Amino acid sequence: IGKTAIVEGLAYRIKNNMVPNALFGYDLYKLNVTSLMGDYNVAGQSESRVDLLVKELASRQKTIVFIDETHLLVKGSSTASGMDFANMFKAGLDRGEIKMIGATTTEEYEQYILRDRAFLRRFQKVDVVEADRETTIKILMGTYPKLEKQIGVKLNYTDFIKEKIMAFIVDMTDEYKRVYEIASRYPDICLTILSNAFTYALFENSREVKMRHIYQAIANCKNVYEDSKKKDMARFKVEFADILREENTNLDEVI
């Protein structure tokens, strides 16, 4: 639910000097822990890579390393090879030579990291709560320009209509989450829907995302029969039209 995005936000703030003086001049790197660890069966190679990384990080004065899926460091010690990658970081973390941000899910945290108290105590635990409705809308509003640039398709409506579209995505997704017990959380599921809508427009060779692409993306987020999806898309069209009319917006052509 946005763990990597939070770290990217920190990197942005560091770059633009929007952080306390203690963080000025820092470099922030993202480490692909899966690639680093490689094949558990080749224990010597994996340990050698981790050892070199630990020494390199310890030699850098102003470096923060971000490790997503941090539980994999601890999980390694529970495999047949018995490699304890987490243990290789402990001394550097203790001495303050290594500055690390780790991220994982609540489930993986409880299953793996809680078992290694010595590794756990070297971190400050921060829970990232699921975004609420208003926050998710803001995230979507901040995301669509990036999708326009990446995919080459425009969401060519006024800012007012765009915000209504984002709110509609969130509200319809919330309905699906409750009715069909969809496990995905905010903002992830809404970001997927928005991205899919842009992709549908691209596949139609359209230069713009239309509301039909939005309706289709929302309907496809649940695993049901096509007839049900078509009915939902028709319902979405009516409901979104009602929302615009309630706002005294005479833009039926948007629908």
Where are these regions (language model features)?
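AAA+ P-loop NTPase nucleotide-binding core of proteostasis motors
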Residues: 1-255
